[in-house]
C-alpha cells in the first residue's frame, strides 16, 4: 500500500530542513549567552524513538535530492505499513540510567554510508543554542521500528535516501532534535539531572599464599589459579592459606594464615569456590563505598535545586510534528515537556543525604569524644596508679632508712656501754691490785726483818780488804727487783704487757751485773757482808722473799747446800786462776789475745728452776768468782753463741751482742734465712751472709732440740760477755801461683 502525499512529504521536509538551516545560521551569528548542550556521545541516543521514528540521513554529495527514487525500488514508491500495537508490546520505553548504552547495529556495505556519518561534524545540522539540553532516555535496541529503520540504507552511488514514510507514531520534539546535534558535543560522563554516572564495579583479584605439608610457604598466586587447583581437588580443607593485604576486605584475614575450611565457614558457602566467592564479596563492598563517595558532593540541596530550576527555564520549547514535516490533515501533535526528574524529589533526596551526612558526622563525633574520654580516664587511672606506687616506694625506702639509723644508734650505744663497763672493770682491777701489792709489801718486809740473821750464819772468812770494797748499786736494785717479782708471781698475776716490760728490765740489769762480775771479779777468798749491806739499805729489808718460801724447811736446806757448794768450789779457784788471766783484776794484758770464756754452771738444779732469779743473784754476788769457776758443764746455747762470735767479722763500731740479739729474736724457721742474710751483709763487708744464715739456722735448730739447757738465749748471751775488743783482723794477701 502506497502512502498518500509522499511527494508532498518529501517536498515539505526539504523546505523545513532549509528553514532550520537558516535558523541555525542566524543563531550562530547572534552569539547568545547560554549553557552549552551536554549530551551523551553514544550513537544510540540519535536513532532510538519511543513510538517509532523515521530514519533519515542527509547526503552531503551536491546535487542530491529527496525526491529521487532508489535503485532498489525500480521507480516505485517505497512500501509502508501501518503501525500496530503488537510492535510496542514488551518494548521498554525508556532506557535505565544505570545500564550502559550501546551503539545501534548498522550494517556496513558498499551501498550504505559508513558509521562516520553518525559521528561526523555537519555544519548544516549544528544548531547553537543558549539553552541547556537534557539527554534523552535511551531506547532498548529490540524495538521493531528501530530495526525497520536501521535496515534501510542510503545508496551513496545514486545519492538517494530510503525513508520509512509511514512512522509508527507521531514523533516527539525530543526525537525531532536528536539528529540536529552531533555526538562529539556530548560528554561521555554526563547522566540525567546533571549528576555524574556511577562508576562500574571494579573487579579485584586477590593474591593468595599457602603452606604445604612440609611447612614451606608458596605464593603469591592469583584467585584464578587457586580456583583451578581447588576445583581440580588439589586443596584439602586443612590447607593453610593467607591473603595478601594489598586491598581492604571485610573478613579480616589479610596476612593471616587460616585453614580453607575456616574461610568457607566465614563465607558460609560450602558448595562453591571460596576464592571466587571471596572476591565477589570484596567487589560488592568496594562498589557500595564508591556509591557513597559519589553521593557525597551532592549533599548540599541548595546547589542541586538551583541547577534544576535553571535547566527547566533554559530547555527548548518542544517542536510539534506539523512544524517539522508540514503535513496537512493527519494526526495532531501534542506538546511534550521533558522533565527528567522532579525538583521536589531531588530536593527531598538531597535533604535526606544531608541528614544522613549530619547524623554520620554526629555519630563519628560522639564516638571520638567517647574514645577520648575513655582514653583520658585510662590515663588518669594509670597516673593515679603510678603515684600510688611511687608513694609506697618512698614510704618503704624511708622506713628502711629509719631502721638502719635505729640499728646504728643501738649499736653505738651498746659499744659505748661496753667501753664504760670495761673501763670500770679495769679501774676496779687496778685498785684491787694496788691494795694487794701494798699489803704484800708490808707483810714481806716484816717477815724478812726476822729471818735475815739466818742467811748470814754461815758466812765465809772475809778478806782483809773486804771492808773497803764497795758494792755497785746495780746489785742492790737487782736484789730488790728479784724479791718483788717473786712476791708478785705468788700473788695475783699482772698483765702481759707489764710482765714483759719488767722481765726485759730485769734481764738488762742482770746483764750489767754479770758483765761487771766477769770483768772485775773479786779474789777467791773475798766475801761480802750481806748483813752490813741490808743495814745500810733499809729499803731492801722490806722487799724480801715471800713468807711461804722462808718458812719452808726444804727451801732453807737447799740454800744451805748451795752455800756449801759455793764454799767448796772456792778451793778450786787457785788451780784455774792462771787460765783466766783476762778475767782477774790482778793480771796485766800484754797482747790482744782471744779471751777464753770460763765455764759457767748455773747455780740452779732442775728441781730449783722455779725459784726466783733474785736469790741466784744474791749468791752470785756474794761469791761471783768462785761460782763461775766451779761450773763444770757448758750450756748448749753458750756453745752456739761462742760459735756465732767466732764466725762473725763485723765492721768497726758494731758489737756482736747487738747483732746476735737481733738474730736470736727471729723465728727458727727457713723464713728467717733472708732476714739473717740481709743483716750480715748490712753489718759486714767480708762475711758471706748466705752461708752464715744457712749454718746459723741449722745449728740453732739442733741446739733447741736438746731441751736440757737451763739458760735462755738472753741469759746465755749476757753470760758470754762482750769480747768485741778481742777480735783482731789481718789483711791476707793473695798467694802467688793461685788462680782462685
From Swiss-Prot:
GO biological process entries: endoplasmic reticulum to Golgi vesicle-mediated transport; nuclear protein quality control by the ubiquitin-proteasome system; protein-containing complex disassembly; regulation of transcription by RNA polymerase II
Function (record text): Suppressor of the MYO2 gene.
Further remarks about this protein from its record: Present with 486 molecules/cell in log phase SD medium.
Entry keywords, A to Z: Coiled coil, Cytoplasm, Phosphoprotein
Keyword Coiled coil included in the entry's annotation: yes
Originating species: Saccharomyces cerevisiae (strain ATCC 204508 / S288c) (Baker's yeast)
Gene symbol of the encoding locus: SMY2
Cross-referenced SUPFAM superfamilies: GYF domain (SSF55277)
Matches recorded under Gene3D superfamilies: 3.30.1490.40
Annotated stretches, region: Disordered: 346-510, 523-548, 567-592
Protein name from the UniProt record: Protein SMY2
CDD domains: GYF (cd00072)
Taxonomic superkingdom: Eukaryota
Subunit structure: Interacts with EAP1 and MSL5 (via the GYP domain).
Chain intervals with Low complexity compositional bias: 452-467
CC terms in the record's Gene Ontology section: cytoplasm; cytosol; endoplasmic reticulum membrane; nucleus
Entries under PROSITE patterns matching the protein: GYF (PS50829)
Feature: compositional bias, Polar residues: 474-486, 523-536
Family: Belongs to the SMY2/mpd2 family.
Composition bias type Basic and acidic residues, residue spans: 364-439, 500-510
Subcellular locations according to the entry: Cytoplasm
GYF domain sequence ranges: 205-261
Positions where Phosphoserine occurs in the chain: 12, 96, 545, 602
Amino acid at each position: 500500500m502506497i502512502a498518500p502525499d509522499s511527494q508532498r512529504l518529501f517536498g515539505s521536509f526539504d523546505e523545513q530542513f532549509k528553514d532550520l538551516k537558516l535558523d541555525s545560521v542566524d543563531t550562530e551569528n547572534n552569539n547568545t549567552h547560554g549553557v552549552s548542550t551536554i549530551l551523551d556521545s553514544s550513537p544510540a541516543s540519535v536513532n532510538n524513538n519511543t513510538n517509532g521514528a523515521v530514519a533519515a540521513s542527509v547526503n552531503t554529495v551536491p546535487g542530491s535530492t529527496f525526491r529521487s527514487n532508489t535503485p532498489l525500488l525500480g521507480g516505485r514508491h517505497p512500501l509502508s505499513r501501518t503501525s500496530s500495537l503488537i510492535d510496542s508490546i514488551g518494548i521498554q520505553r525508556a532506557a535505565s540510567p544505570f545500564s550502559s548504552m550501546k551503539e545501534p547495529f548498522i550494517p556496513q556495505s558498499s551501498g550504505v554510508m559508513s558509521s562516520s556519518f553518525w559521528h561526523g561534524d555537519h555544519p548544516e545540522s549544528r544548531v547553537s543554542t543558549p539553552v541547556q539540553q537534557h539527554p534523552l532516555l535511551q531506547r532498548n535496541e529490540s524495538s521493531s521500528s528501530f530495526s525497520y529503520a536501521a535496515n534501510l540504507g542510503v545508496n551513496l552511488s545514486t545519492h538517494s535516501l530510503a525513508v520509512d514514510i509511514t512512522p509508527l507514531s507521531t514523533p516527539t520534539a525530543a526525537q525531532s532534535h536528536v539528529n540536529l546535534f552531533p555526538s562529539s558535543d556530548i560528554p561521555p560522563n554526563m547522566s540525567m539531572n546533571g549528576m555524574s554516572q556511577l562508576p562500574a564495579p571494579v573487579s579485584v583479584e586477590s593474591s593468595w599464599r599457602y603452606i604445604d605439608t612440609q611447612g614451606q610457604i608458596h605464593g603469591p598466586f592469583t584467585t584464578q589459579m587457586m580456583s583451578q587447583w581447588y576445583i581440580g581437588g588439589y586443596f584439602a580443607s586443612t590447607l593453610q592459606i593467607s591473603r595478601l593485604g594489598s586491598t581492604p576486605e571485610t573478613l579480616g584475614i589479610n596476612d593471616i594464615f587460616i585453614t580453607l575450611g575456616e574461610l568457607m565457614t566465614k563465607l558460609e558457602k560450602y558448595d562453591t569456590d571460596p576464592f571466587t566467592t571471596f572476591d565477589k564479596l570484596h567487589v560488592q563492598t568496594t562498589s557500595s563505598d564508591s556509591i557513597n563517595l559519589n553521593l557525597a558532593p551532592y549533599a548540599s540541596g541548595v546547589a542541586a535545586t538551583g541547577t534544576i530550576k535553571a535547566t527547566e527555564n533554559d530547555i527548548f520549547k518542544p517542536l510539534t510534528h506539523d512544524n517539522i514535516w508540514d503535513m496537512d490533515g493527519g494526526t495532531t501533535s501534542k506538546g511534550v515537556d521533558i522533565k527528567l526528574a522532579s525538583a521536589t524529589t531531588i530536593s527531598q533526596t538531597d535533604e535526606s543525604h544531608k541528614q544522613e551526612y549530619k547524623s554520620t558526622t554526629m555519630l563519628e563525633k560522639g564516638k571520638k569524644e567517647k574514645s577520648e574520654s575513655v582514653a583520658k580516664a585510662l590515663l588518669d587511672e594509670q597516673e593515679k596508679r603510678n603515684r600510688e606506687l611511687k608513694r609506697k616506694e618512698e614510704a618503704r625506702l624511708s622506713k628502711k632508712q629509719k631502721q638502719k639509723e635505729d640499728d646504728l644508734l643501738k649499736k653505738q650505744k651498746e659499744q659505748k656501754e661496753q667501753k664504760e663497763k670495761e673501763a670500770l672493770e679495769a679501774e676496779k682491777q687496778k685498785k684491787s691490785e694496788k691494795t694487794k701489792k701494798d699489803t704484800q709489801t708490808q707483810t714481806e718486809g716484816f717477815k724478812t726483818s726476822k729471818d735475815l740473821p739466818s742467811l748470814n750464819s754461815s758466812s765465809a772468812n772475809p778478806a782483809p780488804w773486804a771492808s773497803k770494797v764497795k758494792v755497785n748499786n746495780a746489785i742492790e736494785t737487782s736484789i730488790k727487783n728479784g724479791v718483788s717479782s717473786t712476791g708478785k708471781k705468788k700473788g695475783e698475776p699482772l698483765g702481759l704487757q707489764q710482765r714483759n716490760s719488767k722481765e726485759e728490765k730485769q734481764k738488762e740489769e742482770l746483764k750489767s751485773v754479770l758483765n761487771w762480775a766477769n770483768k772485775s771479779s773479786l779474789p777467791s777468798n773475798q766475801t761480802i757482808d750481806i748483813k752490813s749491806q741490808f743495814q745500810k739499805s733499809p729499803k731492801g729489808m722490806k722487799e724480801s722473799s715471800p713468807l711461804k718460801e722462808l718458812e719452808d724447811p726444804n727451801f732453807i736446806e737447799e740454800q744451805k747446800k748451795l752455800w756449801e757448794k759455793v764454799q767448796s768450789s772456792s778451793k778450786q779457784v787457785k788451780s784455774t786462776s792462771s787460765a783466766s788471766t783476762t778475767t782477774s783484776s790482778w793480771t796485766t794484758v800484754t797482747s790482744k789475745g782471744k779471751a777464753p770464756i770460763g765455764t759457767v754452771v748455773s747455780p740452779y738444779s732442775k728441781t730449783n728452776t722455779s725459784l726466783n732469779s733474785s736469790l741466784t743473784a744474791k749468791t752470785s754476788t756474794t761469791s761471783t768468782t768462785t761460782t763461775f769457776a766451779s761450773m763444770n758443764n757448758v750450756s748448749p746455747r753458750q756453745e752456739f753463741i761462742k760459735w756465732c762470735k767466732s764466725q762473725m767479722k763485723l765492721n768497726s763500731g758494731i758489737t756482736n751482742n747487738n747483732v746476735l740479739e737481733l738474730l736470736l729474736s727471729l723465728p727458727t724457721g727457713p723464713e728467717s734465712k733472708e732476714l739473717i742474710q740481709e743483716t750480715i751483709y748490712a753489718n759486714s763487708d767480708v762475711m758471706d751472709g748466705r752461708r752464715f744464715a744457712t749454718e746459723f739456722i741449722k745449728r740453732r735448730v739442733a741446739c733447741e732440740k736438746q731441751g736440757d739447757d737451763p739458760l735462755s738465749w738472753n741469759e746465755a748471751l749476757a753470760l758470754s760477755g762482750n769480747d768485741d775488743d778481742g777480735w783482731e783482723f789481718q789483711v791476707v794477701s793473695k798467694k802467688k801461683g793461685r788462680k782462685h
